[in-house]
Amino acid sequence: MTAFVLVSGGYTGGWLWRDVAAGLRSAGAEVHTATLTGLGDRRHLAGPGIDLDTHIEDVTQVIDHIDPDDTPEVVLVGYCYGIYPSVGAADRRPERISRLVYLDSPMPQDGYSMIDQVREQMPAGPARDRTLSQQERAEDGWRIPAPSLAEWRAHGNLAGVSDDALARLDRLASPAPAGPYAQKVRISEAVAALPTTGVFCTTGGTMDIASLEALVASGLPLVQHLADPRATFFDMATGHWPMLSTPEELADVLLRAAAGEGHRLRSTVTTVATGDPA
């Protein structure tokens, strides 16, 4: 039996996965939705001391409370910022993770914070500027206000999200602690050895399978490991909130990812045999 651990990003909580979790459970999977400290229905625990280690421990505890005898395979799904505590937890418990899923998320790098990666790798534009200004907007130096309804509409990449789902997002969104975004993540080679799946939301997004294949073909060192046959990929023609816009399709994608399905990239690395000169 497979257990899915679903980790949401900033401003949200386990509630975000309601419809996806229902779809996974109807297919016979076990589902755990992680709410990170200071977010969602745990917003009352927010404080200036919350950092990335806090959120990594949140996810680690969810994994530790899944009985390995009953459910040996854990598929860990990190969405948006949620990939950072997910990768950190996978680094602590690699033996429990059968697959790590990057759901429309960055690819965390050892020694970088989320803010570091945005600053160095995100294309210039309003989205980058808004993310980098989060610390300046934080109330009391640590609490980042949740977007207003107008801000969700203007900047949330909500393609496919219904008015009812948007109203729910606006009602339940919580402020986010600033500390986790600025803390550098530490990742060992244990994470690199895990099977992975990347899911790209392509409507309004900046990456898809074709673009990634072009990067691999260019020889960019950062992405060459993604041509590993254990790495699979899916494109979803929706905006940044697939659990709200297309929950049934997302549940199907996650089930297929757990089964090892998905697109595989072609490696550009070739082996050349050489012998002694004649």
Where are these regions (language model features)?
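The conserved beta1-alpha1 loop
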Residues: V5-Y11, T35, Y79
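Serine-hydrolase catalytic-loop signature spanning alpha/beta hydrolases and amidase-signature enzymes
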Residues: Y11-D19, V31
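Conserved alpha/beta-hydrolase
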Residues: A21, R25-H44
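Active-site loop/oxyanion-hole signature of alpha/beta-hydrolase fold enzymes
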Residues: G38-V74, D91-R92, I115-P123
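Conserved hydrolase catalytic core segment
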Residues: P72-M114
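Flexible "cap/lid" loop of the alpha/beta hydrolase fold
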Residues: D91, V101-W142, P180, M207, ...
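Conserved serine/cysteine hydrolase catalytic core
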Residues: S174-A237
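Catalytic active-site module of serine/aspartate enzymes centered on a nucleophile-bearing elbow/loop
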Residues: D228-A278
